């Protein structure tokens, strides 16, 4: 507040501070005519009207000023010469502007003879009522004054509603029974020593905070008790009025403290909140400093549990936020939507660890549809991670005469695509899909070296699953058609493949030791082979996989520990030592008892392994019409190879391979 006193002149802010503090007795004298006084005046002001008769009697000393004060006061006033006296009229600014024969000049002269401190209110009642309408009372509800500050209300009629159960007002409001009943106020918190308790308020609904508006009062010890009293009124569905003399400093301090504690606001936020509701509030600096201490006290009480509850609330709001997975190396990594390809070591590690089918978790329902919809071309082009090798992948040439529409990834390839460091991590990620029928119709990983081709197109005869099941019980008796893989599943599953050898056949692929491209026969081909009674000759009859699959598994290659599962396409382009970008694990030797493969004896002369075109049967010609030529311009080495090594061995790694896929059109 701006405190200013010039001679016998006092400003309105200083007068309000004196009235709020209560430390000094202030005698207010209204020198206006009685009609104006009766209309509106400052609280507790005494009217000494400026009639000509009263002026003459004062000038002739026919009446004492003290007697005139007692006569004009509504109740007995203790006259003390040491108390301050403030006189005001309608709009006088200072004593110098007054004429010598006016009533106000005569009144001030007589008061100075009886009291030590006499002051004239600058601006008079007009200025005071404009700045502090809440401290004015009278019969009229509105004070006809000029408004120069739009931020302040014209008149504060009644208490101010801060919250639904909290009102802030002055002494005039609490003494107005009708106004209190209209607002439903049944509790009163009186923050003063002098303001009386209303008669219509019971003692149990009344609380007095005996503090004065001064710079030495302690209001902090009363704040918690005041907050509890307001909460008591709220619990009883009642409204409480917090008031002092003017509703500016003491009562505003208590209201701000309540907002701070119950609405979890800082001092600045609570002050602005109350200021917007009641612009006339102005706690003194002493109370503001104690509110700062109260803010620290609240933070100390709720500091331990506050941040925890907020973090917990934040976590409950985001339950679907992806949680980063921690790999074996201790680094955090999130599962991407388009998983990158891992190195060949991961594929080999996944290929050497057999897992029991019962221990394989289920595949997420989103993943099979994502994999089935992806074409083989995207699978081959997405084998590389680094952006600088994209131009190398563009050199990869492939041409298919068959319309291969989709490909199913194996668990080892999917594990490398998703960036899993081991096969255990991949098996925990992939779980059985609920969309497939049966327990043995899911994409699983197994070290069993049984390969089969699933034709991407539906069979011409539209065979059902019951036909291949008969093939498993009644197999062809012909010796050539019995050249099948005998699969033996080991329960321990820990045997390591010490020697790897390819399946030799005529052609340029035979000369390459590191990679073998193996394809079997589809279910329809096996059925036609049995019904025709023909034995396939040449390398086509090396592998006849006695497996079957439901139509839902058409156009996909699977593999598992049982004979009803297959290798996926990644087994063909997956993890050999030299061509890790394309090939997978090779066939084991016959010496390995765990992975035994029965195949025909390789002829000594490679030229005799294939006959001329006119010597072949029409059945074989029909199979050989459908061929797939795969030409690889340049093989891409594994990711851990440096570019220098790639330049050295680039000429040796390029090869041209032809492979034939047998299919019944």
Swiss-Prot record:
Look up the record and give one Gene Ontology term from the biological process aspect.
Answer: negative regulation of MAPK cascade
Task: Give start-end positions of Low complexity composition bias.
Answer: 354-368
Tell me which UniProt keywords the record has, alphabetically: Acetylation, Cytoplasm, Cytoplasmic vesicle, Hydrolase, Nucleus, Phosphoprotein, Protein phosphatase
Recorded superkingdom: Eukaryota
Enumerate the catalysed reactions.
O-phospho-L-tyrosyl-[protein] + H2O = L-tyrosyl-[protein] + phosphate; O-phospho-L-seryl-[protein] + H2O = L-seryl-[protein] + phosphate; O-phospho-L-threonyl-[protein] + H2O = L-threonyl-[protein] + phosphate
The keyword NADP appears for this protein: no
What is the name attached to this protein's record?
Dual specificity protein phosphatase 16
Q: Which organism is it from?
A: Homo sapiens
